[in-house]
Design a protein with these regions (language model features):
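Alpha-helical DNA-contacting segments of helix-turn-helix folds
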Residues: 90-97, 104
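Hydrophobic alpha-helical connector segments
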Residues: 92, 106-131, 185-188
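Amphipathic alpha-helical segments used for helix-helix packing
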Residues: 129-149, 197
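Short hydrophobic/aromatic patch on the recognition helix
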Residues: 73-83
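Basic, helix-initiating cap at the start of DNA-binding domains
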Residues: 11-58, 62-74, 88
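Amphipathic alpha-helical packing segments from all-alpha helical-bundle domains
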Residues: 99, 148-173, 182-186, 210, ...
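Hydrophobic alpha-helical segments that form the core
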Residues: 124-125, 177-198, 211-219
Length: 226
């Protein structure tokens, strides 16, 4: 009969144990870091969402940091961890507002077709303002607080930037009359500013929507280099 040979289980080497512990340690650190980042983003977004609702309902001046923190269910210390002051938070709220408008326009506009895109951006911008009027912070409240330079800087990331890019492309393709490009960009973006300023006059915007669009299209046609 066969002789029975006892099995000897190999014991892990000391350095293998250290490697396993090291991997577990760094994995724990990364998981904790990811969790902290998620909490950071969540708290930031909660503050912005809460502030935007309160600014729309009551106006910027009537809302306190305590009230914003309370609505966001965070401490006042958490507020100051994310924002230096209420002014900085207003900038973040305005930026979020433009992000939502920009997303709406982008899904409905073919930005590769210059002339058509300029028409579409304006028309869908007008639609969004009319449909979401009651949920927007008036630009008249934003501009005096954050200042024109900050307002323009934020706007350039979204609608204003898109309009400027299209105008630059049309100029390169010699589709525009020989006007100064800065003048053209400022005038075109002035249409959007006009709508934003008069956003609270909802009835007038809705009733005269067709006229706004017709005049805007006529203005665009006058710029074409035939």
């Amino acid at each position: 009969l066969f002789a029975t040979v006892p099995l000897r289980l190999s014991r892990p080497h000391h350095h293998d144990t250290i490697n396993i512990l090291t991997v577990c340690y760094f994995k724990s650190i990364m998981e904790n870091k990811n969790h902290q980042q998620e909490n950071f983003k969540s708290t930031y977004q909660s503050l912005v969402n809460s502030a935007r609702i309160l600014f729309v309902e009551k106006g910027y001046q009537a809302v306190s940091i305590d009230e914003i923190s309370g609505k966001a269910l965070v401490t006042k210390g958490a507020f100051y961890h994310h924002f230096k002051n209420k002014k900085q938070l207003l900038s973040a709220c305005y930026k979020q507002q433009l992000i939502m408008i920009d997303a709406y326009i982008t899904t409905k506009t073919d930005l590769t077709n210059g002339w058509s895109a300029l028409e579409s951006i304006f028309e869908h911008y007008l639609d969004y303002i009319i449909d979401n009027n009651k949920n927007l912070i008036p630009i008249q409240e934003v501009m005096p607080i954050i200042g024109w330079n900050e307002l323009e800087k934020i706007s350039l990331e979204y609608i204003t930037g898109k309009v400027n890019a299209i105008v630059s492309k049309l100029i390169q393709e010699n589709q525009l009359k020989a006007y100064d490009d800065d003048v053209l960009k400022n005038l075109l973006n002035g249409w959007f500013m006009h709508i934003a300023i008069h956003a609270k006059n909802l009835k007038e915007l809705a009733d005269k929507k067709g006229q706004f669009i017709a005049i805007y299209r006529g203005f665009l046609l006058s710029l074409k280099d035939k």
